[in-house]
Amino acid sequence: MEVIILWILNLINMSHYDTNLDKNDANYVPLSPLSFLERTKNIYPNYEAIVYESRSYTWSEVYKRCVKFASALEKIGVKTGDTVSIMAFNTPEIFEAHYSIPMVGAVINAINTRLDPKTINYILEHSGAKVLIVDRQFHEVIAKALENVKSKITIIDIDDKDANLSEYKKIGEHEYENFLNTGDENYEWKKPRDEWQAISLCYTSGTTGNPKGVVYHHRGAYLMATGSSVAWNMPNKLNFLYTVPMFHCNGWCYPWTLSMLHGRVICLRNIDVKKIFELIDKYEVTHFGGAPIVLNMLANAPKEHQKKLKRKIQVLTAGAPPPSIIFEKMKNLGFDVMHVYGLT
């Protein structure tokens, strides 16, 4: 009886907590993974953030580049709620796009690089893309995809100096680095007014009919980024080899997780077994993720490519479970593989 009375009194007193305790700037901030980059820039400005071939950037440099690119997007008319598409390999540009595009309030739409022109055309039309950032290597497929696009799309070329792109024509009116340098590094970027504001638009592939659009919001991306770090027991200052395509579910949301952990991102343009083992050795890689086919390539790589690992490396794989023999081979090479499954 005493317990019931206390319970009733608690219900009556609940109203006290509904008075003058509304959300305000002092007690509430919408969750957004953009806050990870801002924090890491402030606390670990000189930590190496991204390495790719001849290029490397610290976290303060990455932050500055993202802010400038966001500013440049606003200057050409991109605003909150607009879609900015990107079709690129795992180079620094697509990592930066996960911050620069939402910094102007827009939504990043990372397009699968293996799609045909008709499907890409559908995605550009359906998403209402205002801007398309694209690696020059995709000139042919993008040129065809743009033939029947009804609305004006501003094209920004990624001219990767570390790749031999001389045979590929320029597609757009802007080049990524030049465009970035038109932006203001002191630009006051836009934090989401509401954590349910869209941050990303992904499209399914391999489904019946046309691709299906899937919207991520700032809150969801924030929670996915933090949850992944806990589920995989990821430490600070890890060395992450980016083998998962960043167009695939936003690279499993690790562009946001890695800034939260002030890790080092080692970019990989193409899946190449010899290159993967070289990068693992050179940068003391601690973590990477990959589809089962990537694990199969590593497990069955020529012996001359399989460098002896200096430490156990954490590997995350998703999708169809790899055969048990692949798990065994990877374990014998020094990889600790964790299999997961998730939805777009």
Name the predicted role of every residue range:
Residues 22-31, 143, 163-198:
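Flexible, low-complexity linker/hinge segments
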Residues 36, 75-76, 103-178:
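Structural core segment of the AMP-binding/adenylate-forming
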Residues 45-48, 156-157, 174-203, 210, ...:
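Conserved pre-ATP/AMP-binding loop-to-beta segment of ANL
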Residues 46-91, 95-99, 116-121, 172-177:
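Conserved AMP-binding/adenylate-forming core of the ANL superfamily
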Residues 63-69, 181-186, 195, 200, ...:
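Conserved structural elements of the adenylate-forming
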Residues 82-83, 89-117, 125-131, 145, ...:
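A short helix-loop-beta submotif of the ANL/AMP-binding
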Residues 222-239, 247-287, 297, 301-302:
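Conserved AMP-binding/adenylation subdomain of ANL enzymes
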Residues 260, 285-290, 299-344:
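Gly/Ser/Thr-rich phosphate-binding loop
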